[in-house]
């Protein structure tokens, strides 16, 4: 189109200088218009690309924010197959020593209960000062026949830091001999399955804030119950909660009863809760 205009412009030059000016003006105006149009098209394309990128990035951000964080509990499992740890007095003594020293964990909130705080129901507190040495002696543990604790945890932070803190606390007793073992996560799983531990680092995470997702593992027949914990009353209550239609008041009452039994049993050694 530009070449045509220049051709017309050149032919008019021989006839009329005024025509030359008119056609030159038309040509310059068109060229300017086309130049601006090209710039606009380029700018519009860039703007469109940036806007689409912004929408895409923003959509991903919204999706990430909308995804609920997993609610997790951080604890140590006892090996209930161990003849000493089967005794509730021994587990109570260990619990008393660890809880009284408030093991630090920067990324978690201290929680010495079975359930995360957001899911807890009111239960009667049976906690009272405990004479640790007396409990151990009642269990037949003496300085000449001490309690041996093989404590397993991962060899990465924060697990190794927490594991060594727990080990130092328990080693303060003359009746306890501690063997802390920091291992790879894969090795931790292997030793858990073999039962080669007295205390082992554990955690449980759920995507939905459901009480039963945290409690089901305490059933003696549950696939995740690898430490040998078994209580007939706990099994009975879990069956009721999972199979019977209950109103809210009855359900809460059964959960309260179940939690009290688990905490009296010292079924686990709870330490923290966190989200990820």
Task: Give names to the regions the model predicted.
Residues 57-61:
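Boundary at the C-terminal end of the N-terminal hydrophobic targeting segment
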Residues 171-218:
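Periplasmic binding protein-like
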Residues 179-188, 215-276:
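Extracytoplasmic/peripheral linker and loop segments enriched in polar/acidic and small residues
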Residues 8, 37-40, 44-50:
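Intrinsically disordered, low-complexity segments enriched in serine/proline and basic residues
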Residues 68-93, 106, 230, 238-242:
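A bilobed periplasmic-binding-protein/Venus flytrap-type ligand-binding module shared by bacterial periplasmic
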Residues 9-16, 21-23:
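Short, positively charged and aromatic/hydrophobic N-terminal segments
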Residues 27, 50-52:
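Cysteine-centered motifs
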Residues 86-168, 257:
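Append "and occasionally in soluble cytosolic enzymes with long acidic Gly/Pro-rich linkers
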